[in-house]
A protein has these predicted regions:
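Ferredoxin-type iron-sulfur electron-transfer modules in oxidoreductases and energy-metabolism complexes
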Residues: 236-257, 275-368
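Iron-sulfur-associated redox domains of electron-transfer enzymes in respiratory
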Residues: 1-244, 252, 272, 283
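Extended amphipathic alpha-helical segments enriched in small hydrophobics
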Residues: 256-266
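Conserved hydrophobic/aromatic pocket- or pore-lining residues that grip, position, or stack substrates
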Residues: 269
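General structural feature for long, well-ordered alpha-helical segments within catalytic domains
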Residues: 10-14, 265, 293, 353
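Single, functionally critical "micro-switch" positions that shape active/binding sites
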Residues: 21, 262, 341
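Residue-level detector of anion-binding/catalytic polar loops
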Residues: 24, 265, 344
């Protein structure tokens, strides 16, 4: 890969170039003691020397003596809201004075958005969303939003204790799906393009080719991140197909006794796409609007059909979520539905660690 070296003080030049191309730039900022993506205009708005500490049921930030802007693992929310809107109108129906119904699609007109600071796990999750929404009959609303995104990834150098992207094969280094990719060093960044748009943008600058020493430092940084994650216990994610043969395992009852079925895990998951569709009407109005909004398979109403809640117990809902994510996704999309970001672990209010549950369920053959 043709890496250039971007001095730290020149990052503002990249931000300015994106804004001059009419992109609305989103970057990581600290809001209410968490890293979130928000509109930025200046590099001064990025976090400096901020790291995150994550563990089951816990997320906190702390300050360190470092000039780095991207020395954190991940934020509570990924890219999903930018392409798969939490709530949107799909179509409207109107009855005219003769009683004839006409239908109109409600297609968004998304603005051009650039995002800086994206992690490998979130780009991999975006690819999973693409497989769901764009294969066969493409979702037009998703497609329009997806095409409006300019993605600047930053390779992860500080994975959290909850991260396991090296086990899923999705990180910590970015592989595909970006317009630009950066690796942060103490004094600057290595930067390369991954698309024609990214290449054309880089050609506006005369940054020098990265030295062998700088490239070596980036490689060592990536290797250290991998070793940090590999040192933690994690399941063999290539063998999770066995979940479909462990449907009566007693572990489902054990985890259900702890699970609140709150849906936090699916809300922060970058790849979950469960939703519900509703119709909104107004008294006296001839128009009905058909809406789609995020839902969770942990909600009791999600499996309600024809007067029956199919998965009425938390045990059944947790089983559905885990077996779909780690087993039957392979049949649908060719891989598991998890990219190892660890958000479902950090943001679970009772600290359920999905890695522990997978080990207990997949490696115990006594209850097949």
């Amino acid at each position: 890969m043709d890496f250039r070296y971007l001095p730290r003080q020149d990052l503002q030049l990249l931000i300015d170039a994106l804004r001059q191309q009419a992109y609305r730039l989103l970057g990581p900022v600290v809001r209410q003691n968490a890293i979130v993506y928000d509109v930025i205009e200046s590099v001064a708005e990025l976090p400096v020397g901020i790291q995150d500490e994550q563990s089951p049921g816990s997320y906190r930030l702390h300050q360190v003596d470092s000039p780095r802007n991207f020395a954190w693992a991940n934020s509570p929310q990924a890219l999903k809201p930018l392409s798969f809107a939490p709530r949107e109108s799909l179509w409207s129906a109107r009855r005219d004075e003769h009683g004839v119904l006409s239908f109109e699609p409600c297609l968004p007109e998304p603005e051009q958005i650039a995002v800086i600071g994206i992690r490998a796990c979130d780009l991999a999750a975006l690819d999973l969303q693409d497989r769901h929404f764009l294969q066969q009959n493409a979702d037009p609303a998703y497609e329009r939003r997806r095409e409006s995104l300019f993605l600047i990834a930053v390779n992860c150098s500080h994975p959290a204790a909850t991260c396991f992207c090296s086990h899923s094969g999705d990180g910590p280094s970015v592989k595909t799906g970006y317009d630009l990719v950066m690796t942060e060093l103490d004094d600057g960044y290595l930067i390369a393009s991954g698309s024609l748009r990214g290449k054309l943008l880089l050609e506006e600058f005369s940054w020098a080719v990265a030295s062998a020493e700088q490239r070596r430092e980036a490689e060592l940084q990536a290797q250290a991140s991998i070793e940090q994650m590999q040192a933690q216990a994690a399941p063999d994610l290539s063998a999770t197909d066995v979940l479909t043969s462990r449907l009566e395992h007693p572990r489902w009852e054990e985890v259900a006794a702890r699970c609140l079925a709150c849906g936090n895990c699916t809300a922060v998951c970058p790849s979950c796409f469960c939703h519900r569709e509703i119709d909104e009407t107004e008294l006296g109005s001839p128009t009905t609007t058909h809406l789609r909004e995020w839902d969770s398979c942990f909600g009791q109403g999600h499996s309600y059909i024809h007067g029956l809640t199919v998965r009425s117990e938390t045990r059944l809902r947790y089983r559905q979520w885990l077996t779909h994510k780690f087993a039957t996704w392979k049949e649908q999309y060719g891989r598991i539905g998890c990219t190892g970001c660890g958000r479902c672990i950090s943001w679970c209010p009772v600290g359920i660690d999905v890695r522990e549950e997978l080990v207990a369920l997949c490696e115990d053959a006594a209850h097949v």
